[in-house]
Amino acid sequence: MSVKIRLQRHGKKGKPFYWVVAADARSKRDGKYLEKIGTYNPNTNPATVDLNLDAAVKWLHNGAQPTDTARAILSYKGALLKHHLDGGVRKGALTQDQADAKLATWIEAKSGKVDAKKEGLTKAQSDAKAKAFKAETVANEKRIATQTEAAKALEAVVEEATTEEVVETATEEANEEKEA
């Protein structure tokens, strides 16, 4: 029986969520599987991968062939590197301690890169938020300035109209006095 390590789709329409499973190559995409190895959530940025490294390496040792996307996920989490290093230990090129040390340094470097990306994304998001807030305050100041100018212009027009009325009434009264 040939075994594949592949993704099994779960989640809603438009919101995929995958299980990383070891399944018989002849079974359906979302059908029966032998073992659930982990999960993959592409909806987050960066994508969230939860993988049982030992189970994945066990299936790789047993000859399971990962699909392209599953291979990328296994590589991202270090399962392929561990499988490669275990091959070196079996051949006698490395000791188990050396292989574990190489894997640990690689995992630390990889987690540093992922953390840097997360920090960069949060920084970019906060910068965009601050820029939008600044643009909004500038727009509010302009709007308030135009409203005050319009209010002053309206006051001037009303004041001018009242002075004209006073002048008209004064001239009318003067005309009435002359006639009388």
UniProtKB/Swiss-Prot annotation:
UniProt-listed InterPro entries: Ribosomal_bS16 (IPR000307), Ribosomal_bS16_dom_sf (IPR023803)
Family annotation (Pfam families): Ribosomal_S16 (PF00886)
GO biological process: translation
GO molecular function per UniProt: structural constituent of ribosome
Keywords assigned: Ribonucleoprotein, Ribosomal protein
One cellular component (GO) term of this entry: cytoplasm
NCBIfam families linked: PRK14521.1, S16
Family listed: Belongs to the bacterial ribosomal protein bS16 family.
PANTHER family: 30S RIBOSOMAL PROTEIN S16, SMALL RIBOSOMAL SUBUNIT PROTEIN BS16M
Protein name: Small ribosomal subunit protein bS16
Species of origin: Flavobacterium psychrophilum (strain ATCC 49511 / DSM 21280 / CIP 103535 / JIP02/86)
